[in-house]
Amino acid sequence: MKEYRLNMLSRADMVKGQGVLSAYEEELRLISGRLDRIHGDSGDFKLNISINDKIDGDITHIHTVNPEFFLRLPAIKSKGIAVGSVHFLPETVDQSLHLPSVARQAFYSYLISFYKSMDRLVTVNPCFIPKLAAYGIDPQKISFIPNYVSGSVFSTVDRQQVKELRSSWGLDPERFTVVCAGQLQTRKGVLEFAQIAKALPQMQFVWAGDFAFGGMICLERLITMTKK
């Protein structure tokens, strides 16, 4: 049986509590120990996984757009295939970045160049495919693979446990509860979430998330809104 090596490149752990990191970690958990025998068109094969290895693999999956990975691309592509994850586009992070106009445009140009340099792209959002195509990227080399979470970590609990969990967080155990998880950013819909909460005071609304990337402005708007 043939063996190949999959090298996973990521610096998502540089900032804790954000979606790219959790998506990367969940993917690692999903594939770990499950690639020993893969059925291919030309026979079975095995994928050995390495993480942030300096030696490039037959397949190198780049999860974050760090310049150090971009500079390695010629060597990566000379040995194998470069696969890039598309977690965001210029228009989806525009409200989250607080950069001068020139720096902002330079980053956006770099981001699209990064994506264009990949042999294959994987996006977590199917709506990104036509948008990437509008940037001049061949949609045939883009695959949609949604994010996923571990069923053993996120699972249903019985009614008594629900009450206990709510009480432990200072919530009314009996009220209808709405929960949203995400970074505290305008693009995540936190202001709309707050507006709905004000309109439905009979329910309790909980937002689980931090402001790792420029969320302070959003927080200021949220505080202003709640005072009105």
Language model features: what each stretch is:
Residues 1-49, 198:
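N-terminal subdomain of nucleotide-sugar transferases
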Residues 12-14, 181-185, 211-213:
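Short donor-sugar binding/catalytic loops of nucleotide-sugar-dependent glycosyltransferases
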Residues 58-64, 75-95, 122, 145:
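Active-site proximal beta-strand in glycosyltransferases
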Residues 102-121:
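Membrane-proximal helix-turn-helix segments that form the acceptor-binding/catalytic region
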Residues 127, 148:
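Carbohydrate-associated surface elements
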Residues 155-171:
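A short helix/loop element that forms part of the nucleotide-sugar donor recognition site in Leloir-type
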Residues 166, 172-188, 194-200, 206:
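Conserved donor-binding/catalytic core segment of Leloir-type glycosyltransferases
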Residues 204-228:
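Short, structured helix-loop element that forms part of the nucleotide-activated donor/catalytic region
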